Amino acid sequence: MVKSTMSAVLLVLHIFVLHLQYSEVQSLANTSSHDFSYLSFVYDATDPELEGSYDYIIVGGGTAGCPLAATLSANYSVLVLERGSLPTEYPNLLISDGFVYNLQQEDDGKTPVERFVSEDGIDNVRGRVLGGTSMINAGVYVRANTSFFNQTGIEWDMDLVNQTYEWVEDTIVFEPDSQTWQTVIGTAYLEAGILPNNGFSVDHLAGTRLTGSTFDNNGTRHASDELLNKGDPNNLRVAVQAAVEKIIFSSNTSGVTAIGVIYTDSNGTTHQAFVRGEGEVILSAGPIGSPQLLLLSGVGPESYLTSLNISVVASHPYVGQYIYDNPRNFINILPPNPIEASTVTVLGITSDFYQCSISSLPFDTPPFSFFPTTSYPLPNQTFAHIVNKVPGPLSHGTVTLNSSSDVRVGPNVKFNYYSNLTDLSHCVSGMKKLGEVLSTDALEPYKVEDLPGIDGFNILGIPLPENQTDDAAFETFCRESVASYWHYHGGCLVGKVLDDGFRVTGINALRVVDGSTFPSTPASHPQGFYLMLGRYMGIQILQERSASEDAIRNLGFQENILDSPKSTSSFAF
């Protein structure tokens, strides 16, 4: 009784303190319906009108691809080729309650959530819809850790970075209302020593805080597709159900140059689109799609490509190498009384681990990849899923082709979870802290028996080790309960495949701008960084083109070059 009373007091204090701190926030978006104004320039890939030449072709209309396209369209013609369909075809994508449903929906080859199982035996998913993973994720929004920028090997314009974040945030990011379970878990984090209390912030900060969300307070999802509305509709075309099969290259004395792409529509008909003049092909197909497409196009390890009878365009030993996935370990508690469903809005952040939680209604069908395998026991009542994420990580694996000719056949992916013992150590630290979280007064009312410490909960799945000092037992727990956090990244790293301008080294007019480019997760959730990256790189490219054209004018070549079709913003077919 005393502990329950103390929990209530802590809860009231927590809400009061956070309320005082939430008022000091930057300008965010206002609650509204999902804005599909961009549909006026969306085409099905079967439309022959799409074939022609553009200043930029972007492969992938996902988290980074949409803001990149919108930005480039300010001055140039842009074609976005998205392999998935429109989100309007799947209404559950657009509501917070649909997060679990979308994982439950059977993969028919077209659904927005594409299923795969890594060679580690862990279930996982990819986005296959306009908006990419920003259309299927849990909606968490946070800016990158400031230390992340220093580790990338890139000289960032931090003023531009911050302006770019704001460009994203005033359209699709919201300050979430305090949900009951999220407030409770936040109180537990503070009580367990994940300090300080940072109130509301979209910055990556050590401690406990309420973070931004791409779900508004009516439960409507806002994703990267809405950033297309900021583009110039006269310069922008988006093709859906367009599976890019290969990059087209030309070769001459100036080297190998990307000049276009081959893509197929939903009927299997082949099409081509080209870039003109100083234009580029930009891959934004993600950590699995971008290395896969490079390999299929003959850019990768020479001996590997030769063994598959793929003509080598450029020898690149690190394409498909160094892919990482942040391990997710967790505890599920089944409380004695029903709790409301909630998405992640409260985070507990330390240098060794990141923690969060969702609460959910019962499952009648396994949500694919929510648990490590489909054989995992299902909750028959409301439950809380309390999660630990290992930052980094340091363990890494590979993307290799499952088909040497068909992009629709997903590649083989192996992440080698916990092969690096530092990752395992961070998991042990995080799960021990989760034990402290379970032992707080804040979670006492969620026990089914009045027992001390971590005992007394109705646990679904593997319980924490009883002995909080037994590192070996925790290591076993980490290995046996690991699931994907869905935050996999790498495969086309800056410094190995790309230069600091995200150009594929040794090839002209080809860049990669997406989650395949860095070896570590930028924050507790990567979505905010990659939304920013698309816009940021769009501005960088515009600035490069502007400087180049100014130089050409100064050399007296304006009439011959600047007035040629490549530099106009109209479409040419």
UniProtKB/Swiss-Prot annotation:
Q: Which Pfam families does the record match to this protein?
A: GMC_oxred_C, GMC_oxred_N
EC number(s) reported in the record: 4.1.2.10
Q: Which cysteine pairs make disulfide bonds?
A: C427-C478
GO molecular function terms listed in the Swiss-Prot or TrEMBL record: flavin adenine dinucleotide binding; mandelonitrile lyase activity; oxidoreductase activity, acting on CH-OH group of donors
What range does the record give for the signal peptide? 1-27
What enzyme class is recorded for this protein? lyase
Q: Which reaction does it catalyse?
A: (R)-mandelonitrile = benzaldehyde + hydrogen cyanide
Assembly description: Monomer.
This chain's protein is named (R)-mandelonitrile lyase 3
Q: Which organism is it from?
A: Prunus serotina
Gene name of the record? MDL3
